[in-house]
């Protein structure tokens, strides 16, 4: 395994971990706790596969799709739902009796760590196993890994609200899964549809929609961080 592809796969997650740590600099979490949460996030990969493979075997998840509906269905069923469900389960296991989870921002920080643990390993698998690793590494550094960062912010934002606003715990607990699943599903749907045979003009529109969506995804995540810091 070449060192350069491996390094290029690692860097995006490390940079974003440093960014969320910096945003929480006024009341930072113990570094050991952050490393534990990130390491736990790596386990979301095998957990996701444990969900996906049986569903593929019984035919619930499509191995191939040739229609727009099939692309959207696959985006949610094979990626968005199992991945975000796995991350939320691991986040819950990590925080359910964690005394360091005592501020709203903490939920975002730990959820981002779990999400980037997942994204880091996923990125390594995509980059180092691809001959055209450089272009894959660049595109995923710009879109895929920051996307997982944003899903983590969404999950942690509502997870914290569920803890610190107990009167609305059920609603916020549901949103901690639903919101990142929808965001992740839309992101993947736009990409998956572009892999189906569609007219060039429609592909151009979808590409524009994808770029606009990514912009607003990051904007929403930034605002959510500010709300919980404030």
Where are these regions (language model features)?
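Hydrophobic alpha-helical segments at protein termini of multi-pass membrane proteins
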Residues: 1-230
């Amino acid at each position: 395994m070449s060192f350069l592809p491996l390094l290029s796969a690692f860097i995006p997650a490390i940079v974003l971990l440093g960014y969320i740590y910096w945003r929480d600099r006024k009341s930072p979490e113990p570094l050991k706790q952050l490393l534990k949460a990130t390491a736990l996030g790596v386990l979301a990969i095998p957990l996701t596969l444990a969900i996906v493979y049986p569903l593929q075997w019984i035919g619930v998840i499509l191995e191939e799709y040739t229609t727009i509906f099939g692309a959207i269905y696959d985006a949610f069923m094979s990626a968005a739902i199992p991945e975000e469900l796995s991350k939320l389960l691991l986040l819950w296991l990590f925080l359910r009796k964690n005394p360091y989870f005592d501020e709203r921002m903490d939920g975002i920080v730990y959820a981002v760590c779990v999400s980037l643990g997942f994204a880091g390993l996923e990125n390594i698998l995509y980059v180092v196993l691809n001959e055209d690793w450089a272009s894959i590494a660049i595109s995923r550094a710009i879109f895929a890994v920051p996307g997982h960062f944003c899903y983590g912010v969404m999950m942690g934002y509502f997870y914290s609200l569920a803890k610190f606003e107990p009167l609305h715990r059920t609603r916020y607990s549901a949103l901690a899964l639903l919101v990142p699943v929808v965001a992740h599903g839309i992101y993947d749907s736009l990409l998956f549809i572009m892999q189906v045979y569609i007219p060039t003009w429609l592909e151009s529109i979808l590409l524009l929609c994808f770029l606009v969506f990514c912009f607003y995804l990051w904007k929403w995540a930034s605002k959510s961080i500010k709300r919980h810091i404030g």
